[in-house]
Amino acid sequence: MLKIFSSLCLRTVSGLLLVLGLTLSAVALAESQVDNSAPLTIAVAANFSAPMKLLASEFEQQTGRPVRLSIASSGKLFAQIQHGAPFDVFLSADQDKPQRLVEQGLAVSGSQFTYAVGELALWSSQQHIDPEQTLRQGNFRKLAIANPKLAPYGLAAEQALVSLDLTEASKSKIIFGESIGQAFQFVASGSAELGFVARAQVIAAGSSDSLSKGSVWFLPNNLYAPIRQDAVLLVRAKTDSGAGQFLEFLQSEYAKNTIQNFGYGSISVDAKGSQ
């Protein structure tokens, strides 16, 4: 009886181990089988929307892989990723948020790099004015900037105001946009006479009526900390060859030229993110 019982136990245990092994194999296989026909979902900081649309279109033509963009402030996208948003790649407007995602285990270590160096502009939709002097003299009702808690360009705008010793003088006139895109719209719509925006936005809107009637001051780089923008591969896409392929494409000469044509600074050796 004891031998029969032992034999049954061994068979039961062996069966359970077999089932467990098959289950684990199935899970591993499912994780490794990525649907490369599904859209690649990329979270993009608002300042980079115009060049990103061109780059996404070119990537789709080269690879056949569709791309879906989610455009918002870096802070908003960062929070969405932390709460499980289904993004494959994150293009932030700073280096801090991608690095924090790596530290939190939400992004792949070693995948982070600087794809652009942003520059700040003070824009007005009014023609034939000097935005710098208008700002210094306080001859405006409203000044639009992106929320510095969410958008690195908003933080850069705050730094510029400090450098210009205009923080107190402009405090009551500031209106905050959720992103640099909304700050731009505040100026374009006339809700604000002046706005700190990305140089790239001004260049992207170069043929629009709103810009052709406007005025711009490109701020000297010494008025704010460098806006080094990093990309990172998110953990959910670590086995997706298409996501890795896109990050390689973003570092290609074609991509670099496109990015620089939109007014972003060149990426020097010391401007690179973590590799």
Role assignments for model-derived ranges:
Residues 11-25:
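Bacterial N-terminal signal peptides
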Residues 26-62, 68-71, 75, 79-85, ...:
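Exported/periplasmic ABC-transporter solute-binding proteins
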